[in-house]
Amino acid sequence: MKFDTVIMGGGLAGLLCGLQLQQHGLRCAIVTRGQSALHFSSGSLDMLSALPDGQPVTEITAGLDTLCRQAPEHPYSRLGAQKVLTLAQQAQTLLNASGAQLYGDVQQAHQRVTPLGTLRSTWLSSPEVPVWPLFAQRICVVGVSGLLDFQAHLAAASLRQRDLNVETAEIDLPELDILRDNPTEFRAVNIARLLDNEEKWPLLYDALSPMATNCDMIIMPACFGLANDTLWRWLNERLSCALTLLPTLPPSVLGIRLHNQLQRQFVRQGGIWMPGDEVKKVTCRHGIVSEIWTRNHADIPLRPRFAVLASGSFFSSGLVAEREGIREPILGLDVQQTATRAEWYQQNFFDPQPWQQFGVVTDDAFRPSLAGNTVENLYAIGSVLAGFDPIAQGCGGGVCAVSALQAAHHIAERAGEQQ
């Protein structure tokens, strides 16, 4: 099977890369083993929250300029501030075109409220998520009886520290009892599958309506809206106060929805989606990827003109830690890591951890190297890249988006030259 591009990994980076390549008229396939990290995320995307020295970032352009000086090997630094901003804006346009109407400005970070009621600087958030400052003085944090993925009293306690009048309440929907037989089934995603049925909408409205009369804003867990935000908008039109939603513990409704929107758009535009498959071997001849062998296709290789590695970091098994060191399991690419295992981590759990910055070694075009030699038609994007800390620096979503589009533009340019 011949393709212009085969993308190994179906997470945020892989999907955005595929969508951008489709804009250039290239035929793409995505090989994905299972759920991506988006299923376990908040559904919000960070651009740059903090610098390597710990200084918080509010003005993105100035932050990117400082980052170039502090961390020249960071993926952003390799591209330059202006290029990063341009690609980020293009990514936001792609997301909107896919149906993910996210709120945010690439030039200026905003503060979203987290499930614990604290604030986190971010780039793009779902419109349901409350954003600071909250234009409400009387707030009711509403939990769902029996739902362990969200603790209303913890969120309320944090918000009270910001001089807000915050109460807590709980709704009990007997219609959800069918899920209570097994506590492991009473999760936000399973509740959403039930509440998203239009016939159940009035039940949720009736439960929230009495609380809405006594407050300016209701904050509740995101336990509905797997496909879209229609129910949230329907409730907001009818309730006497604003309704906002907070992400829950994984799996996350908002994260799954974002992934599904991108995946459906990719298939709608003619992309080949290969779920439940796994790349077992990649054949490289003379520094060029010629064949990609997958588990489900056995002796029928995929033959791409270009290949993209979007396999993620340790969480997605894009990187594997062993006693002897860190390795990239598909091709055995060169990995940037510390010299000894003792340097992988800091003793204080909350300090930035060196292992977070491990990843494949690439050139400035994000082409990785194998045994010191650049693989000419292979690009690495997203969390598998080295040189950034997605947790401490708050840049995971941005790096995925920016590197994906940079690789896509590079491939499209080279594909045009080869025709």
UniProtKB/Swiss-Prot annotation:
Listed cofactors: FMN
Q: What is its EC number?
A: 1.1.5.3
Q: What keywords tag this UniProt record?
A: Flavoprotein, FMN, Oxidoreductase
Keyword Acetylation listed? The answer is no
Q: Name one GO biological process term.
A: glycerol catabolic process
Q: Report the GO terms under cellular component.
A: glycerol-3-phosphate dehydrogenase (FAD) complex
Q: In which pathway does it act?
A: Polyol metabolism; glycerol degradation via glycerol kinase pathway; glycerone phosphate from sn-glycerol 3-phosphate (anaerobic route): step 1/1
Q: Does the keyword RNA-binding apply?
A: no
Which Pfam families does this UniProt record tie to the protein?
Answer: FAD_binding_2
Q: Which catalytic reaction applies to this protein?
A: a quinone + sn-glycerol 3-phosphate = dihydroxyacetone phosphate + a quinol
Q: Which GO terms describe its molecular function?
A: glycerol-3-phosphate dehydrogenase (quinone) activity
| EC primary class | oxidoreductase
Q: Which InterPro entries has this protein been placed in?
A: FAD-dep_OxRdtase_2_FAD-bd, FAD/NAD-bd_sf, G3P_DH_GlpB_su
Q: Which domain of life is it from?
A: Bacteria
Quaternary organization: Composed of a catalytic GlpA/B dimer and of membrane bound GlpC.
Biological role stated in the UniProt entry: Conversion of glycerol 3-phosphate to dihydroxyacetone. Uses fumarate or nitrate as electron acceptor.
Q: Which family is this sequence assigned to? A: Belongs to the anaerobic G-3-P dehydrogenase subunit B family.
Its recorded name reads Anaerobic glycerol-3-phosphate dehydrogenase subunit B
Q: Which organism's genome codes for this protein?
A: Salmonella arizonae (strain ATCC BAA-731 / CDC346-86 / RSK2980)
Identify the taxonomic lineage of the organism of origin. Answer: Bacteria, Pseudomonadati, Pseudomonadota, Gammaproteobacteria, Enterobacterales
